[in-house]
Regions:
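Positively charged, helix-rich recognition surfaces that bind polyanionic ligands
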Residues: 3-5, 16, 124, 134-139, ...
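Surface-exposed helix-capping loop/turn segments at secondary-structure junctions
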Residues: 37-40, 81-91, 293-300
Length: 367
């Protein structure tokens, strides 16, 4: 299942309706959770309670019926996630009720929507202008309507399509992620860490300080909150753009990609490096590699990181040695050494901006 995300531009009247639908879905979500906490665990019995709930609360009819029904499934999905975390030894609390302002999305799961003449037509809302910056390929199974904390609205189309494997390249590569360099690969390319958070933190702190000085409930406080949300949103967008382009490059050009199996949740507990590891978003990068590889017919092989950075031969870079050892383990040939695999032409440091601007870390196309 793929997700296509597009910006929505509702009118003031449409935004008012969208906010009313969000509130209706939040109300139903909390009511379903209340019923579950009261001992009702049958999903279909809970769905049967919705018509009576709408009779008691006529304003709920402002929302599309399937959107309200989806909140029953959302509660059960969240409960399953908590149960899975608990089985894996994680400490988890109870599912929480959603407060006003903390409910961000609702779903048209099967019907009630269509695209027509540059507009997304939603049942109970009407036609909303949408910026379709790319073609949707595949069968649309549902639409998520989401409001970001910055106040921007988006439509996320859930699309089912057939994966199309890329042509085999015969190329293999090992990747070692790090703090100084975002990654070093076994061909001798070192991608600089973009450090988006470090570059944004001062702006975020200034906006947090301004927000803290505004009177609660005032219009000025809301304006300050939106400015802060936009700063965080820009940070996330910059980071995701970099990670998507870099992961896409490796998927397009290498048939096998070997990486370390990292315990990132444990690593971030390091008080000196935790923030830098989170800023680098290694976990997100590795997840992008994995799901893109699955669709493209590529292989991402995770290896045990133990010992990959030890016993560095004279004249070799430590991160390059680690990348070569990761590759040899990924190929199932641990006896291969960096010396036998051959030194790189010359380690080349590539600015993160090169990846963002060209979509490739290399000054040439790998084919």
């Amino acid at each position: 299942m793929l997700a296509y995300r597009f910006r929505l531009y509702p009118s003031r009247e449409q935004e008012k309706t969208l906010l009313e639908i969000l509130e209706a879905c939040r109300f139903v979500y909390n009511k379903v959770l209340e019923w579950v906490n009261g001992g009702e665990s049958n999903l279909f019995e809970l769905k049967r309670r919705l018509p009576k709930l709408k009779e008691e609360n006529p304003w709920l009819r402002k929302a599309y019926s399937q959107s309200l029904q989806n909140e029953v499934f959302r509660v059960f999905k969240n409960l399953r996630v908590l149960s899975a975390l608990k089985r894996n030894g994680r400490k988890v609390g109870r599912l929480r009720f959603k407060g006003a302002g903390w409910f961000k999305s609702f779903v048209y799961p099967q019907s009630g929507f269509k695209l027509e003449n540059g507009k997304l037509i939603l049942s109970k809302v009407g036609g909303i202008h949408i910026r379709l910056h790319r073609e949707i390929v595949g069968r649309v199974k549902g639409v998520i309507v989401k409001r970001e904390r910055s106040g921007k609205w988006f439509a996320i189309f859930q699309v089912e399509d057939e994966p199309e494997p890329l042509p085999r390249t015969g190329r293999v590569i090992g990747i070692d992620v790090g703090v100084k360099h975002f990654l070093t690969d076994s061909e001798g390319w070192q991608i600089e860490n973009p450090r988006f958070y470090e570059r944004t933190i001062e702006r975020i702190r200034r906006r947090q300080k301004k927000l803290s000085k505004k009177e609660k409930g005032s219009k000025n406080r809301e304006k300050a909150r939106v400015k802060l949300a936009k700063a965080y949103e820009k940070l996330v967008n910059q980071r995701d753009d970099f990670l998507h382009k870099l992961s896409r490059f490796y998927i397009n050009n290498y048939h096998l990609i070997a990486v370390e199996r990292l315990n990132i949740s444990g690593m971030v507990r390091n008080h000196h490096l935790g923030g830098k590891i989170l800023d680098a978003s290694w976990g997100k990068f590795l997840r992008m590699l994995s799901y893109k590889a699955e669709r493209a017919g590529r292989r991402v092989v995770e290896v045990n990181p133990r010992g990959t950075s030890q016993n560095v031969p004279d004249g070799f870079d430590r991160d390059y040695v680690a990348a070569c050892r990761i590759l040899s383990l990924g190929l199932g040939r641990p006896e291969l050494t960096p010396v036998e695999m051959g030194p790189p032409r010359e380690l080349v440091s590539v600015p993160a901006s090169t990846v963002v601007e060209s979509g490739s870390p290399h000054p040439f196309t790998v084919g």
